[in-house]
Amino acid sequence: MHRTNLLVLSGDPHRAPMARYRSDLRRLRASDPAVRAMTDFLREPPLTAAEDCALDTALDDMFRLGVRAFLVVRDLTVVGLITAEAIRQARRSAATRIVEVMTAAADMPAIDWQTLQDSTIRDLMEIFEGARVDHLVVLESKTAQHASVRGVVHRSRVERRLHLSADPL
């Protein structure tokens, strides 16, 4: 899928950041619909970081919020994805910015909204394993060249809800 002009669809931006993860308490089964594992940005605003943010600041914010990734934005347009793992692996100084380390929007691991609706949790786990990724951005196509970021699926949250991992994040 050609990914230019990715816009963030978002719900109520004033909702408390940690309130969004209450859905993580519901147990999942491998046969459940994959959409049950998605953080839907129509209901819960995404956690984002500006591309010029310092890596250390982004990592501190991730730790404080209990997350492992942020969408990277410029003027409400998604330009990439930054993960805690990418930050930890980067050679960095206080001057290193997200834009230097992030995965560009065109290279973000993604799944189409329609495909997600037709998938199960088992299918998601196979995608995570096969692609060796920890996050899948959910894209909703508007036209052949334009898509919006509808949500995200986090591997660690799926595993936790499947009771496959004791990892607290």
Over which residues does each language-model region extend?
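Tandem CBS (Cystathionine beta-synthase) repeat/Bateman regulatory domains
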Residues: 1-169
